[in-house]
Amino acid sequence: MAGLPNSSNALQQWHHLFEAQGGQRTAEATQHLQQLLRLGLPTRKHEDWKYTPLDALLNGHFVADEGASLSAEQRDALALPLDAWRLVFIDGRYHPELSDDLAASGVEVSVDNQRQHLPDALHPEVFLHLTESLAQTVTRLRVPRNRRLDKPLLLMHITRGLAGDALNTAHCRHHLALESGAEATVVEHYLSFNEQPHFTGGRLTMTVADNAHLQHIKLAFENALSYHFAHNDLLLGRDASAFSSSFLLGGQVLRHHTSTRLGGENSNLRLNSLAMPVKNEVCDSRTWLDHQVGYCNSRQLHKTIVSDKGRAVFNGLINVAPHALKTDGQMTNNNLLLGRLAEVDTKPQLEIYADDVKCSHGATVGRIDEEQLFYLRSRGIEQQAAQQMILYAFAAELTEAIRSDALREQVLARIGQRLPGGTV
């Protein structure tokens, strides 16, 4: 793929950041860097990047600021009010002094640079290779066989923007393994320490073994000048289930991938997302799902609410492999445009190579229903309040699936900030 005219400068800077790691570089990270350099960076001419602007990002002066820390009071001021086992990462680096001791949790945790046994990427792309090459450590979380966690695991990622034109660059690499019969809830929380620009790269792989059950929630709550590029992989075994919800609620350019492989019969997947770009923000959500074996079930629901001059992008693919009989897969993308200049680009896709399957996809793009608005106004509800009621109801199908009341309230508060009349 051809690179942008200015991409060589960005690639050179990222190569320099990689070289600066010195002896910490691994063979696996080197391979990812080589893949990145071979691919180059995409242009608008490339179909997958047609609607995702990279020019401003690639003109940045990338640095990896080291040595930053926060006080416990600063951490708590940013933290979710959630009773959870918490691991804290600042600018991509693990800080044990700000994290909980997980000895009593039943979760085995290791933070090192050993990458030999990490799963291969399901659907690699350029920024996946970037994060794999620049993340300095790997955080491994293992939930043993038949263990059921009593509290969620919370991965708290705090990134600082820097004064001047330097773009602080933070990359996180995590791997979660649920062994057979295990159950866990994992929350990824991404936030900004201040209002300065920064660049976050995230990579989380999750293996859900036979008869294991995972609930995963991602909260992308970074500031309006941030860049966020992340790629999560899910691999499910026989009789396993996973329910993943991503709330993409902040960032100048935010692009999130979820790639999934259903590799064991009778596995079940629910994959949801909510994106709410405002002002000039761009939010790009992508899913890739491989029904590799038969007798599996998947349900996807992806919604966007686009305000002002914002742009939302959705691209989803369900692939049904040969012999994956009795596959049942559905994917829905619903979009609401609140501004005359708001835009959405949606592309749900099916690739079916097996017989006797039940698969469907669909997308809708519209505006607030005037009849609903008239009904609420006729009952004395003001225009803005009536709009907000309709929009909260539109998002409710996603927010009501959050089991934790405290977490749901935080998501609803963030949604409220991004609605017309909110504080964003």
Where are these regions (language model features)?
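Short, low-to-moderate order helix/coil transition modules at the start of elongated helical scaffolds
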Residues: 1-203, 210-213
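Conserved beta-strand/loop scaffold segments within soluble protein domains that form the structured core
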Residues: 117-381, 395-424
